[in-house]
């Protein structure tokens, strides 16, 4: 396994009876980046995150964090991680500050300003008499995130952190998650079923469906795959690539398989390219312009059902 990854899994699997909730999952979370685990509800996101945190034991496979196996190193690794998995058990008759003070004591958080800093980050008041039981769903979600970051962890694992938030709240959460990564150097793994939010936030994306990882690439690479392009169907894509590089000094293309190639530079003359292919012995059966949205791409990858 590559020690350049903060999180790396190898064939991670969780099986309940005959049903695999997660199947042979291999994800790679890079240092100082936001990794978005994207999939519809029931795709296996929460189960994956629970295995990464030692809350659920894998049926098989391995989890490595900072290059070390999680199994046997939980006491060393887990204190360096902040997490939001489902809903924390806050006391309903205490304020946000009182709740966090209890958790700070249990965790031995030494920084006296940690509670206020965490509440400031998520936009909750430090001196507030409102009880947790009086909080809206969005405020409860903010407090859960404050708890996750209070001990200044190096790595954050957040399961659906924008659940229950209104559009303004979602934008604010997006902003401070981005700040945690860009300004404070945190590595963040975030899950969501909302494509539009992941595409606005993540640097790298893993698409999970029915427990299997379908794609894992940077957002820029995925956007290129779904952008406007010219698709060529021909007899030999490797030879076509050499012709594009030699005759047109062009490298902005991607080979899909032996017979399909995508050209991403829309300014090149298609007629001249086809002529060059034919003159060099290639059979060209199709050449046409395609435009696929990021949503269309995800629908295609997940078998047509799509993601919100």
Predicted regions and their residues:
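Generic structural signal for individual residues within well-ordered alpha-helical segments
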Residues: 78, 100-101, 116-119, 171, ...
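Non-catalytic alpha-helical coupling and interface elements of nucleotide-dependent molecular machines
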Residues: 105-108, 303-307
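ABC transporter nucleotide-binding domain
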Residues: 175-264
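Short, charged/small-residue-rich alpha-helical element at the C-terminal edge
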Residues: 228-301, 308
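ABC transporter nucleotide-binding domains
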Residues: 4-9, 14-190, 195-209, 213-215
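Short, Lys/Arg-enriched, disordered terminal segments
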Residues: 1-5, 304-308
């Amino acid at each position: 396994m590559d020690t350049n990854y903060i999180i790396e899994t190898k064939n991670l699997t969780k099986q309940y009876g005959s049903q695999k909730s997660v199947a042979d999952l291999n994800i790679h979370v890079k240092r100082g980046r936001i990794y978005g685990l994207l999939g519809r509800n029931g795709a296996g996101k929460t189960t994956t995150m629970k295995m990464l945190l030692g809350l659920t034991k894998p049926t098989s496979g391995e989890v490595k964090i900072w290059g070390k196996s999680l199994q046997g190193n939980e006491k060393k690794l887990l204190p360096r991680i902040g997490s939001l998995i489902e809903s924390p058990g806050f006391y309903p008759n205490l304020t946000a500050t009182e709740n966090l003070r209890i958790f700070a004591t249990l965790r031995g958080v030494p920084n006296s300003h940690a509670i206020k800093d965490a509440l400031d980050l998520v936009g909750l008041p430090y001196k507030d008499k409102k009880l947790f039981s009086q909080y809206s769903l969005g405020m409860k979600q903010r407090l859960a995130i404050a708890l996750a970051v209070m001990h200044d962890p190096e790595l954050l694992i957040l399961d659906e952190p924008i659940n229950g938030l209104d559009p303004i709240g979602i934008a604010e959460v997006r902003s401070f998650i981005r700040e945690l990564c860009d300004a404070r150097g945190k590595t963040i793994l975030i899950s969501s079923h909302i494509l539009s939010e992941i595409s606005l936030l993540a640097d790298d994306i893993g698409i999970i469906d029915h427990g299997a990882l379908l794609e894992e690439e940077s957002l820029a690479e995925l956007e290129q795959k779904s952008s406007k392009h010219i698709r060529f169907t021909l007899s030999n894509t490797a030879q076509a690539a050499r012709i594009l590089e030699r005759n047109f000094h062009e490298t902005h293309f991607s080979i899909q398989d032996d017979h399909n190639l995508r050209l991403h530079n829309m300014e090149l003359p298609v007629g001249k390219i086809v002529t060059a292919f034919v003159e060099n012995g290639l059979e060209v059966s199709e050449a046409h312009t395609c435009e696929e949205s990021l949503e269309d791409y995800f629908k295609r990858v997940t078998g047509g059902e799509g993601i919100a």
